[in-house]
Amino acid sequence: MRSIFTDKVSDTMPLPEYPRPQLVRDGWQNLNGLYDYKISDSSEKKPKDIDGKILVPFAPECFLSKVEKGLKPTERLWYFKKFSLNDNLKGKSILLHFGAVDWECKVYINDTFVGSHIGGYCAFTFDITDFLRDGENELSVCVFDPTDSGWQQRGKQVNKTHGFWYTATSGIWQTVWLEAVDSCYIRKLDVVPDIDNNLISIDIDLSAEMKGVKIKARIMDGDSVLAEKTVKQHDEIKLKKYEYWSPENPKLYDLFITVSVGDKAVDSVKSYFGMRKFSIGRDKKGITRLFLNNEPYFQKGLLDQGYWCDGGLTAPTDEAMIFDISEMKRLGFNMLRKHIKVEPMRWYYHCDRLGMLVWQDMVSGGAYIGDFYAGVLPNVGIYKLKDNKYNRFSRGDKKWRRNYYEELEEMIKQLYSVTSIYCWVPFNEAWGQFDALKVCDFVRSLDSHRVIDHASGWYDQGGGDIDSMHKYILPIHLRKSKKRAFVVTEFGGYSNIVRGHTWNEKKAFGYLMFKSKESLTKAYKKLLDKQIIPIIDKGLSGTVYTQVSDVENEVNGIYTYDRAVLKIDENVLKDINSQLRY
């Protein structure tokens, strides 16, 4: 199936944009493009022949990859790419970056093993300087991905699609790129704004301990210098004058960091930040609310699964990423709940600069918990089950739980400085849920500056900052909580098949189906008018309607899967969103 962006995808260099806007250097080289590939048996020996060409970074299962073939749990997917360093990278140390590879991969340069990584959703890096030779080099990657036959974090990926379970994403699905650095460089830069004390905190992780290191920071607003300071690796920078960041005013400031050893500058990077504060608090009526910049702020959101009919988990172009964010904002929404997926860093950058709040889910794992726990009990109003009986929600093995913690920490550290991320969501509807209270404490220990929805939807353990309700069948009712803000974190899901713009019309799935745009719009308006708007003054602090677009057989998007047709009248969407406020 083609999207409205399919024809804009380059066969030689798809997604050519700089992949990490939060930490920008001049010396880099994009390795996206056509690779040789081979799907082999379980042997990890380098194959002698190839099956054909694959367009990276699109997974083999999707249309844009030019393969359109899945990877079995017993197979290995091999990639081969010959490359030479661009002139501006020569004479430096070379880092090889992968935005994401699903799930386990081993990386080789010129047939020499470089390193491995486990986890399908986060970025990782290898220093390949000592493996390179003059002239042409070869990158080889071997991937193993068990999808739903394994226990790993994988979201809704399955080997056999049905309902709201989707086509797997195997192998490389985000940008592959090279970066040139010196012997001492900034490995990681964290920035935390503090509007209560008019400052930012910075944390700079250097690759090496060296004598005579000096670090200079400069904060810019366009051409104007707001602050300059020689800083330590852990330091604060005061700001005298600034604007708050918000969806209505997504003001960002540039941050330039230069590292010198003696008189020589060894690293220079550009970053950015927004001055904002996320919290919960009491309004004038004493109701616990979501707060933005110390003021109550109603969040009107959409569930955003980040799937594309032509690219799977990979947006076909940067423009496509921007479309979903800017179009939802144009329709009056101010929040996206990024549902059990971690996006490329450019997606978060676009949310930062366009002004879109993000609730970030952790990717779910474990085996399916079964229809009784996943559907029957919650839909008759039973939410009070403890999650420390690990087999109940498919986390019986210690290694499953340990791996979850490892990947959760990896995600939070990667996204820590994203301006727009408002809330962490460790668990969704009990899929692989365990020890949610302890996990909430763990998340808080990593990041105390954001709100936490510790168990979105079903089996609430009474922790976190959000009293989180999912309602698709029974009527929505208000739950009052003194300590937590009440948010309907999933609802609606009203469905409509648009002929010629649907993945599979015969297998189309939805909770409540409507025959036309008019009937769908009327039902949407009635749902919001009758069940949402009346309870805002009484305690509702935010909503998440399901969802941004159709996804495969699931036809409950406000847009079709190809992003060609808006299925609900835009004037109604805008009018209702204008009423969703305190």
Name each model feature, range by range.
Residues 326, 335-576:
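Substrate-binding/catalytic cleft of secreted carbohydrate-active enzymes
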Residues 71-77, 90-92, 124, 251, ...:
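Aromatic- and glycine-enriched glycan-recognition loops and surfaces
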Residues 180-210, 284-289, 580-582:
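Surface beta-strand/loop "capping" patches
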Residues 21, 36-42, 69-185, 209, ...:
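Accessory beta-strand-rich segments of carbohydrate-active enzymes
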Residues 108-114, 220-222, 262, 293-294:
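Short strand-turn-strand beta-turns centered on an Asx-Gly dipeptide
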Residues 130-136, 205-283:
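Extended acidic/polar, glycine-enriched regions
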Residues 189-193, 256-328, 579:
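N-terminal carbohydrate-binding accessory modules
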